């Protein structure tokens, strides 16, 4: 029976601290994460204001570094972006996580008799869906470690894959998907005991603590 989760990272270029519930302003998300999520919209030349307004987020907030949005607004934004680009992973992997993938992931794990088996199935599923990011589950008693692997940083990969550094937001999104899924399965907020990453902290690092 797993009671907590630790996070570590291998073969990557970013350092990330996992999101913890904030003592202040619970249920809110930094505008920095909104800007990160919107990067795929800008890169594709789509209408950012239209996507933001679907989530009830004023476009001017992107120019206010201390602004925050509600967790619900960020969830609606995630859905709107996924619908706009047909990718539930914000276009951050070479292979898109097409709309409907997360629903199928939930169906794939819902009948698991233990959380450990559910996480193993989830990691196998994500390995099939994504090309560059994958995870490994290491259990030590009641503590589970999720080890993140990023193929973009492998030395034997084509140079084109490593030409652009991986955004820490990609690593965080991968872990948030897994952690949110695990909490949903057991109906509890599973505590994150710690995180270890191999490079400097990204912008808005305090927001992940």
What are these regions (language model features)?
Residues 3, 7-151, 203-204:
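N-terminal low-complexity or simple alpha-helical regulatory segments
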Residues 115-209:
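Alpha-helical bundle regulatory/interaction domains
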